[in-house]
UniProtKB/Swiss-Prot annotation:
GO molecular function terms attached to this record: structural constituent of ribosome
Protein family: Belongs to the eukaryotic ribosomal protein eL21 family.
An example Gene Ontology CC term for this record: nucleus
Keywords: Ribonucleoprotein, Ribosomal protein
Annotated GO biological process: translation
Protein name (record): Large ribosomal subunit protein eL21x/eL21w
Gene that encodes it: RPL21E
Pfam families, per the entry: Ribosomal_L21e
């Protein structure tokens, strides 16, 4: 008989709990606050069957568009044929975690705000654009003596007489 195509087909390893992370769910999982617009990673917890998203969304990053008592609405991109569609799914909080994808952006934004405030106090205008890293500066190699290398003439006749 052919293999089944159920909702949880081929998820034996995908939904398995990590080593030494089996057992009870920590309370911090339920005490996290999610706000609309936050980026979250969908990471299915195989121990909790309620509110579990489809296996396609496991490992995807999305943006929260709705917050309810026990779940959050996540908007995830999904490629269907030749187009990308934004899918809206509701997932329980046990199956999502805060994403670190915008961490660097938020840090850079804070640094730019400080730089802009300092520049405004001095009465200057600055550019906060990121610039590509330029070439390394040149340097001189010290303490080296030059040696001229000349090739040895290749003698075909003697090479054939000597054999291998």
């Amino acid at each position: 008989m052919p293999a089944g195509h159920g909702v949880r087909a081929r998820t034996r390893d995908l939904f398995a709990r990590p080593f030494r992370k089996k057992g009870y769910i920590p309370l911090s999982t339920y005490l996290r606050t999610f706000k609309v617009g936050d980026y979250v990673d969908v990471k299915v917890n195989g121990a909790i069957h309620k509110g579990m998203p489809h296996k396609f969304y496991h490992g995807r990053t999305g943006r929260i568009w709705n917050v309810t008592k026990r779940a959050v609405g996540v908007e995830v991109n999904k490629q269907i044929g030749n187009r990308i569609i934004r899918k809206r799914i509701h997932v329980r909080v046990e199956h999502v975690q805060q994403s670190r994808c915008a961490e660097e952006f938020k840090l850079r934004k804070k640094q730019n705000d400080v730089l802009k405030a300092d520049a405004k106090a001095r009465g200057e205008t600055i550019s906060t654009k990121r610039q590509p890293k330029g070439p390394k500066p040149g340097f001189m190699v010290e303490g080296m003596t030059l040696e001229t290398v000349t090739p040895i003439p290749y003698d075909v006749v003697n090479d054939l007489k000597g054999g291998y």
